[in-house]
């Protein structure tokens, strides 16, 4: 029995048993968006998914869509050993502080494993995420990876970009961020994260007052309320 009014039968010894017997079935794609949201938002369910992904027993083939290992292996003609070998081969490419499959795609796109999984960038990213020691920041239709969670945030990633390439306009940092990591941010999200972190002047060449004025001119919302919004 769990909070939020959700329970599984006592015939199951664990959430993992319930997950495998009742949810992620052989030959089917488990889509979180189509499930009872009371279930998919349970911390126990999320924890179970994460553990099974780390053990390479289930795979995320698209955002919040999962299949069992057997399904992936049969559909793509790969083995568990192929997945582990891919992780071992790709790890040396993950030398930047921040990375994901998109940021190294030019280097891996012609690998046999990548072609066998039909160049599924999301799947490759989720497999890379499960390399020991890597943590993830889910954002804007993708997720960014790092071996250090201490500075894994949008402002620090922007600072990392400008440390290498110099300060930029808000439009340019938004474009560069999306280009490197395959994200879909609009500039208002980047702006709010930089403003609230106090790192605007370290990264952006535009004056922050001018940006706030432009919001006031183009929005029917209260500016303070808009800037206080939590996006993630």
How would you label these PLM feature ranges?
Residues 1-232:
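C-terminal non-catalytic scaffold/interaction domains in large multidomain proteins
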């Amino acid at each position: 029995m769990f909070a939020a009014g959700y329970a599984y039968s006592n015939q199951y010894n664990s959430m993992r048993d319930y997950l495998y017997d009742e949810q992620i079935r052989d030959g089917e794609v488990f889509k979180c968006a189509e499930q009872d949201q009371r279930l998919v938002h349970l911390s126990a369910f999320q924890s179970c998914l994460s553990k099974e992904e780390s053990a390479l027993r289930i795979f995320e083939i698209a955002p919040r869509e999962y299949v069992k290992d057997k399904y992936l292996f049969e559909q793509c003609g790969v083995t568990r050993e192929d997945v582990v070998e891919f992780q071992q081969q790709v790890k040396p490419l993950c030398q930047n502080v921040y990375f994901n499959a998109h940021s190294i795609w030019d280097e891996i796109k012609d690998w046999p494993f990548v072609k066998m999984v039909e160049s599924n960038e999301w799947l490759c990213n989720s497999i890379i995420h499960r390399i020991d020691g890597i943590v993830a920041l889910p954002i804007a239709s993708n997720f960014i990876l790092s071996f250090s969670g201490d500075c894994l945030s949008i402002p620090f990633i922007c600072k990392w970009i400008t440390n290498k390439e110099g300060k930029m306009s808000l439009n340019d940092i938004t474009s560069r961020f999306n280009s490197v990591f395959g994200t879909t941010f609009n500039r208002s999200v980047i702006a709010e994260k930089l403003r609230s972190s106090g790192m605007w002047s370290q990264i952006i060449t535009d004056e922050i007052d001018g940006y706030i004025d432009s919001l006031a001119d183009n929005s029917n919302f209260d500016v303070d309320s808009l800037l206080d919004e939590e996006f993630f």
